[in-house]
């Protein structure tokens, strides 16, 4: 177990321990809640793993992070299944040591490897525990913790099985996405003189999109010179994808290829249509940004949660669903042309997206943390008076 410092020590009244890691879909909602409570005077500490994304992202946002040793709970083979209880027990002891050191008033689990042992350690330490599920189908860690948590909340309806008291609050989003919603008032107006397509594959990229979209764009450009594309490839894919596009498209500025997009809110504002996977954070961000989308869910996602995420907007006529098994040059090209040929449909999709968005999820979750800290403090005072 180790600690990486990103936030100076301050004598603050309350402390929140955030458990979130592995992917940006867990981490960034946690940061959004942390930022909200920090602004209210709370001290923030993080629990994660040293070999995952949170080890770099969390300190960059100014928060201390402690690491425990834990990997996925789902056994990939017999040996992994047999040793998992021992690894979980070790990580539980590590998490309890962190809790004794940090002394949090509230612990919140957002998903990721550290959430299960950290949440169990909070329960054993009698620290109020909140669980937040970002996906439309709850992950294993959150399903387990939901049975012992003081409060369970989620982004999408029916994320948990019946019998668990759940509050639907939406996904906490970065402030820049919330500001983007203010720009979305003019969603009836398309970008004059261009038809802008944003391709987003996540931090690792989506190989199927990297392969299909260059050929699709060739056909699109031959049908209409107004098409422009911004293609985010993911780590180590930029050179290969760039080479797949015609050089003339890049020279004329019709094609932009980048590994990462640092200002995703600006990218959403630029785009008329986004073609992407259906991670929970992406779905929630697109709703808030009022940007029509074509979702190509990751086919092997656990419990097919990406398809379920996508359906939240698809069923509201705010997005289109194109299963990866049906994705090819012809299918994606025809769908893009069909949408751009119906500007009113795009405008209606944008309006439907915005109506499905939740703008105050960070504030709602922060309020739950405040309420739990107050009620638990009152309980402790009553116990002290009885003694």
Swiss-Prot record:
User: Single Gene Ontology BP term?
Assistant: lipid glycosylation
The portions of this protein that span the membrane are none
Gene3D superfamilies under this entry?
Glycogen Phosphorylase B
Which NCBIfam families did the record assign? Answer: murG
* Keyword line: Cell cycle, Cell division, Cell inner membrane, Cell membrane, Cell shape, Cell wall biogenesis/degradation, Glycosyltransferase, Membrane, Peptidoglycan synthesis, Transferase
Q: How does it sit in the membrane?
A: Peripheral membrane protein
Q: What broad class of enzyme is this?
A: transferase
Role of this protein: Cell wall formation. Catalyzes the transfer of a GlcNAc subunit on undecaprenyl-pyrophosphoryl-MurNAc-pentapeptide (lipid intermediate I) to form undecaprenyl-pyrophosphoryl-MurNAc-(pentapeptide)GlcNAc (lipid intermediate II).
EC numbers for this chain: 2.4.1.227
Question: What Gene Ontology molecular function terms does this protein carry?
Answer: UDP-N-acetyl-D-glucosamine:N-acetylmuramoyl-L-alanyl-D-glutamyl-meso-2,6-diaminopimelyl-D-alanyl-D-alanine-diphosphoundecaprenol 4-beta-N-acetylglucosaminlytransferase activity; undecaprenyldiphospho-muramoylpentapeptide beta-N-acetylglucosaminyltransferase activity
For this record, the Gene Ontology CC terms, alphabetical, are: plasma membrane
Which positions bind UDP-N-acetyl-alpha-D-glucosamine? Answer: 23-25, 135, 174, 203, 261, 280-285, 306
What does the sequence similarity comment in the record state about its family? Belongs to the glycosyltransferase 28 family. MurG subfamily.
Q: Could you tell me which SUPFAM superfamilies the record lists for this protein?
A: UDP-Glycosyltransferase/glycogen phosphorylase (SSF53756)
Q: Which Pfam families match?
A: Glyco_tran_28_C, Glyco_transf_28
Instruction: Copy the pathway line from the protein's UniProt record.
Output: Cell wall biogenesis; peptidoglycan biosynthesis
Q: Where in the cell is it found?
A: Cell inner membrane
Instruction: Quote the catalytic activity from the record.
Output: di-trans,octa-cis-undecaprenyl diphospho-N-acetyl-alpha-D-muramoyl-L-alanyl-D-glutamyl-meso-2,6-diaminopimeloyl-D-alanyl-D-alanine + UDP-N-acetyl-alpha-D-glucosamine = di-trans,octa-cis-undecaprenyl diphospho-[N-acetyl-alpha-D-glucosaminyl-(1->4)]-N-acetyl-alpha-D-muramoyl-L-alanyl-D-glutamyl-meso-2,6-diaminopimeloyl-D-alanyl-D-alanine + UDP + H(+)
What is the designated name of this protein?
Answer: UDP-N-acetylglucosamine--N-acetylmuramyl-(pentapeptide) pyrophosphoryl-undecaprenol N-acetylglucosamine transferase
């Amino acid at each position: 177990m180790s600690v990486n410092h990103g936030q100076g020590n301050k004598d603050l009244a309350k402390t929140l321990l955030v458990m979130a890691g592995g992917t940006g879909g867990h981490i960034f909602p946690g940061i959004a809640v942390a930022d909200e409570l920090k602004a209210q005077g709370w001290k923030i500490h993080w629990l994660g793993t040293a070999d995952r994304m949170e080890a770099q992202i969390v300190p960059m946002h100014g928060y201390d992070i402690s690491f425990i040793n834990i990997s996925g709970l789902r056994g990939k083979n017999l040996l992994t299944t047999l040793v998992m209880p021992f690894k979980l027990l070790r990580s539980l002891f590590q998490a309890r040591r962190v809790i004794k050191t940090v002394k949090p008033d509230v612990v919140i689990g957002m998903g990721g490897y550290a959430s299960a042992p950290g949440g169990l350690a909070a329960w054993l330490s009698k620290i109020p525990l909140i669980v937040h599920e970002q996906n439309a189908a709850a992950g294993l860690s959150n399903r387990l913790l939901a049975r012992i948590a003081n409060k369970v909340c989620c982004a999408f309806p029916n994320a948990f099985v019946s019998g668990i008291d759940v509050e639907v609050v939406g996904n906490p989003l970065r402030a820049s996405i919330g500001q983007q919603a203010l720009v979305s008032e003019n969603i009836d107006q398309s970008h004059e003189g261009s038809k802008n397509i944003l391709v987003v594959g996540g931090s690792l990229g989506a190989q199927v999109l990297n392969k299909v979209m260059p050929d699709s764009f060739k056909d699109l450009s031959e049908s209409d010179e107004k098409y422009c594309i911004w293609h985010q490839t993911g780590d180590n894919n930029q050179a290969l994808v760039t080479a797949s596009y015609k050089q003339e498209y890049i020279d004329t500025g019709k094609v932009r290829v980048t590994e990462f997009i640092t200002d995703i809110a600006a990218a959403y504002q630029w785009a008329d249509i986004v073609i992407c996977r259906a991670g929970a954070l992406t779905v929630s961000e697109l709703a808030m940004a009022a940007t029509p989308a074509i979702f190509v869910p990751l086919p092997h996602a656990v419990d097919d949660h990406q398809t379920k995420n996508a359906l939240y907007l698809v069923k509201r006529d705010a997005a289109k669903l194109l299963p990866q098994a049906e994705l090819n040059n012809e299918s994606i090209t025809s769908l893009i042309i069909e949408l751009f040929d119906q500007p009113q449909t795009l405008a209606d999709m944008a309006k439907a997206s915005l109506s499905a968005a939740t703008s105050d999820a960070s504030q709602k979750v922060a309020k739950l943390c405040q309420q739990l800290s107050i009620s638990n403090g009152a309980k402790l005072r009553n116990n002290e008076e009885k003694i």
